[in-house]
From Swiss-Prot:
<dbReference type="InterPro" id="IPR023674">
    <property type="entry name" value="Ribosomal_uL1-like"/>
</dbReference>
<dbReference type="GO" id="GO:0005762">
    <property type="term" value="C:mitochondrial large ribosomal subunit"/>
</dbReference>
<dbReference type="InterPro" id="IPR016095">
    <property type="entry name" value="Ribosomal_uL1_3-a/b-sand"/>
</dbReference>
<protein>
    <recommendedName>
        <fullName>Large ribosomal subunit protein uL1m</fullName>
    </recommendedName>
</protein>
<feature type="transit peptide" description="Mitochondrion">
    <location>
        <begin position="1"/>
        <end position="50"/>
    </location>
</feature>
<dbReference type="GO" id="GO:0005739">
    <property type="term" value="C:mitochondrion"/>
</dbReference>
<dbReference type="InterPro" id="IPR028364">
    <property type="entry name" value="Ribosomal_uL1/biogenesis"/>
</dbReference>
<comment type="subunit">
    <text>Component of the mitochondrial large ribosomal subunit (mt-LSU). Mature mammalian 55S mitochondrial ribosomes consist of a small (28S) and a large (39S) subunit. The 28S small subunit contains a 12S ribosomal RNA (12S mt-rRNA) and 30 different proteins. The 39S large subunit contains a 16S rRNA (16S mt-rRNA), a copy of mitochondrial valine transfer RNA (mt-tRNA(Val)), which plays an integral structural role, and 52 different proteins.</text>
</comment>
<keyword id="KW-0689">Ribosomal protein</keyword>
<dbReference type="GO" id="GO:0003735">
    <property type="term" value="F:structural constituent of ribosome"/>
</dbReference>
<dbReference type="GO" id="GO:0003723">
    <property type="term" value="F:RNA binding"/>
</dbReference>
<comment type="similarity">
    <text>Belongs to the universal ribosomal protein uL1 family.</text>
</comment>
<dbReference type="InterPro" id="IPR005879">
    <property type="entry name" value="Ribosomal_uL1_mit"/>
</dbReference>
<keyword id="KW-0809">Transit peptide</keyword>
<dbReference type="GO" id="GO:0005743">
    <property type="term" value="C:mitochondrial inner membrane"/>
</dbReference>
<keyword id="KW-0687">Ribonucleoprotein</keyword>
<keyword id="KW-0496">Mitochondrion</keyword>
């Protein structure tokens, strides 16, 4: 009997210890997890609602969008000139100006923009280089005397001649260099460089070695750089203004014609002289050589000029007029 009581006591003690150890373990777990917060999600991100499409509506194709753009471009022009300085360009045709009006606007732009009054004035010409079937005018370089020169420096001109008296005449008339074979050798050795080169006809055979070196500046009859009147050639090239067609674009010529502080009449006279010289390089009976002309300053936009009054007209002989009649 006593043995049975002792066994029951041991079992109760063991059970009590097991229960206490379990309680301690659970309390330790609770103390560790006090600071842990488990977020409860009470909401969800709203999903994008599908676009409501009307019955019968269709998405525009790229062709339809292009048609809409073309309709905008084809909007009829407004009548007259814009009344304000700010306007939609597509609603008005591009303005075409007389030379006097264009010069007046350039001077006005300079005042409004607070730019230099002595800035350069440029003439941009687009040319029709066609001569006939598969023939074009070659890009050319030319020198002319402007009615109102504006360059601050005189060009350096070299004169080729073996005649001692002609060398003296050249030096007296302002030639930078003058001579024969000795001058040719110095140019060949790059000891001398000039802006322009002129020659008398007798020395031309000896100049052949300089043809590639001088390139576009090589003396030619078509450029009036070969002749016997040395003072006249020097007068042209010392104060002359060079114009040339862009070799890359082949039909574009850009040149400085004046400064903005010159009078309107002086700028117009220089412009007319340049156009006359350009038109000399293509027969007049083939039609207008100059297709478009823009006048601009260093800081302004280009103003489209009315070109027809500026182009030289073909003079018909009386005999040809009778034949036409």
């Amino acid at each position: 009997m006593a043995a049975a009581v002792r066994c029951m006591g041991r079992a109760l003690i063991h059970h009590q210890r097991h229960s206490l150890s379990k309680m301690v373990y659970q309390t330790s777990l609770c103390s560790c997890s006090v600071n842990i917060r488990v977020p409860n999600r009470h909401f969800a991100a709203a999903t994008k609602s599908a676009k409501k499409t009307k019955k019968g509506a269709k998405e525009k194709t790229p062709d339809e969008k292009k048609d809409e753009i073309e309709k905008i471009k084809a909007y009829p022009y407004m009548e007259g000139e814009p009344e304000d300085d700010v306007y939609l360009k597509r609603l008005y045709p591009r303005q075409i100006y007389e030379v006097e009006k264009a010069v007046h606007l350039l001077k006005k732009f300079q005042i409004l923009d607070f730019t230099s009054p002595k800035q350069s004035v440029y003439l941009d010409l687009t040319l029709d280089m066609a001569l006939g079937k598969k023939k074009n005018v070659e890009p050319f370089t030319s020198v002319l005397s402007l009615p109102y020169p504006f360059a601050s420096e005189i060009n350096k001109v070299a004169v080729f001649t073996e005649n001692a008296s002609e060398v003296k005449i050249a030096e007296e008339n302002g030639a930078a260099f003058a001579g024969g074979t000795s001058l040719i050798q110095k140019i060949w050795d790059d000891e001398i460089v000039a802006d322009f080169y002129v020659a008398v006809p007798e020395i031309m055979p000896e100049l052949n070695r300089l043809r590639k070196k001088l390139n576009k500046k090589y003396p030619k009859l078509s450029r009036n750089s070969i002749g016997r009147d040395i003072p006249k050639m020097l007068e042209l090239f010392k104060n002359g203004h060079e114009i040339k067609v862009d070799e890359e674009r082949e039909n574009f010529l850009q040149t400085k014609i004046a400064t903005l502080d010159m009078s309107s009449d002086q700028i117009a006279a220089n412009l007319q002289a340049v156009i006359n010289e350009v038109c000399r390089h293509r027969p007049l009976n083939l039609g207008p050589f100059v297709v478009r002309a823009f006048l601009r300053s260093s800081t302004s936009e280009g103003l489209l000029l009315k070109i027809d009054p500026l182009l030289p007209k073909e003079v018909k002989n009386e005999e040809s007029e009778k034949e036409d009649a």
